[in-house]
Amino acid sequence: MHDIHFLFVILWQINKNIMDIVQIKDKKFRISIPESVIKERVKAVAQRINHDMAGKNPLMLAVLNGSFIFAADLMREITIPCEISFVKLASYEGTTSTGKITEVIGINEDLQGRTIVIVEDIVDTGLTMQRMVETLGTRNPESIHICSLLVKPEKLKVELDIEYAAMNIPNDFIVGYGLDYDQQGRNLRDIYTVID
């Protein structure tokens, strides 16, 4: 009986290790942030927003496509009155930020006098976020706050006040939990780092 249990444990570990690596197109990725850690960090960020934004009815502006899962999970943890809308900006092709920022879907809400929280999946160079803050600033909001699931501090090219960062990560290319590699991998529950 002990041998069967031991064999089961070995097979489970082999299967787990196989599941830790995924292939997306021409690249392999390994789990770097498990779903349980992501959920904890999202909840912690939401609690800070609940505390800081109480009585302000913030407008959460989720940046598509990458932040849709983060935004949904974050909103489930927000307990204060708030609204949500979506904007789409692009600066990525494949695994590299192009620096070219194109507004695809605009903002229709009146932002004058509003408290705005930009909800982003990842702040990489910061160029996209800087452009977003500048664009929103022309609409006279009361304040603009940045909330990002992930931040790559060593890759930032501009100074940003990211008040609500769930996690700082190294300068690696990642997928999962809404982040993609050429539009694939967004559906993965964990976050994976490229290994080749």
Task: Name every feature range the model reports, one short phrase each.
Residues H2-D196:
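PRPP-associated nucleotide enzymes
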